Amino acid sequence: IADSQYGIGDTIFNGSTFSGFNAGTNLKSTYGWAPFNFGQNFGGGTDFLGFTGLAGGFRDFYGCSNYGYVTKQAFWWSSTKQSEDLKWQFDLRNNFTTLIRSAQPERSGYSVRCMKDPD
C-alpha cells in the first residue's frame, strides 16, 4: 500500500501503530470478511476509498507452511523499508476499523499489490 496514495502519511501513524479510526473500514471490501462481533459488528468494510482490500491471511515468518486468518486478516508489503532488516507492512483485520502498520522481517509471507501512480 502506498502511504500517500490514500492520504495516510507518517504523521497519522506516529510510528508503528494504528491509523485513524475508520481508515481500515474505508479500505476493506464489502465482502469476503468473516464477521466479528463483541457488541459491534466490524467484519467487512465500506470500500469508500475504492481499494477493495480483501481478506487473504498471511504465512508466518518462520518459513513454515502455516498460513492463517484467510477470512479475518489481510497483509500487504509497503515499498518502504523501516530499517536494513525490516520492511513496513500494512494490515486490515476483521476485528478492527483501523489500518495497522508495523515493521516485519522480509521473510514473512504477505501480499503484494501493484498500484498505478495517480495521474
Q: Which residues does each PLM region occupy?
A:
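Conserved positions within compact, well-structured domain cores
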Residues: 1-119
